[in-house]
Amino acid sequence: MIEVCCGSFEDAMMASECGVKRVELNSALSLGGLTPSLGSLIMIKQYSDIEIVSMVRARAGGFCYTNYQYEQMLENLKLLLAYGTDGVSFGFLNEDRTIDKNRCQEFLENVKNEGRKATFHRAFDCTRDPYEAIETLIDLGFDRLLTSGQEAIAEEGIHLLADLQKKYGNQI
């Protein structure tokens, strides 16, 4: 299935009109994608049947968050789930560039309790060891992984992408 990254209601409508079945809904794509507005989510649900995976990210500039930023993201997650997002894309890292298991687990519990899907986003591309990271994500129970193979674009990370797909593709 093709998933298109969208930064607005209009982007999602255009994707839907082109036959896309799933979008990752963001705001501020120029900042790498931040949490979208509830209004965008509500309107997309109202005007299309496209599957929506909503980004949960409080700010640009890395994937280690203060306690207040994390709390804000958790509140946004609960609202997005309550308003019908089909899935959620998020990622938390520790200062040493490993997966923050505790924060990911709390988010996953909220997502899974609502019967939705969880994607670990491109925070993966900032991890220190992609093999350790993907095994952690599988153990935690993520459904999908969004990565460019730890490079700026997927073409440059194709060798890592191919290896991860070969070794772990049936697990995440």
Residue ranges and their predicted role:
Residues 1-8, 56-74, 118-129:
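Active-site mouth loops of central-metabolism enzymes
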Residues 1-23, 28-35:
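N-terminal pre-domain/capping segments
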Residues 2-4, 23-25, 44, 52-56, ...:
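Hydrophobic faces of well-ordered beta-strands that scaffold small-molecule active sites
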Residues 10-13, 29-53, 68-70, 93-112, ...:
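Active-site-adjacent beta->alpha loops and helix N-cap segments on the catalytic face
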Residues 18, 47, 83, 139-140, ...:
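Structural motif
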Residues 21-34, 79, 83-95, 140-155:
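Glycine-rich phosphate-binding active-site loops on the catalytic face of alpha/beta enzymes
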Residues 60, 165-172:
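C-terminal alpha-helical cap/extension of soluble enzyme domains
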Residues 73-83, 103-115, 138, 142-143:
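Short, electropositive alpha-helical surface patch
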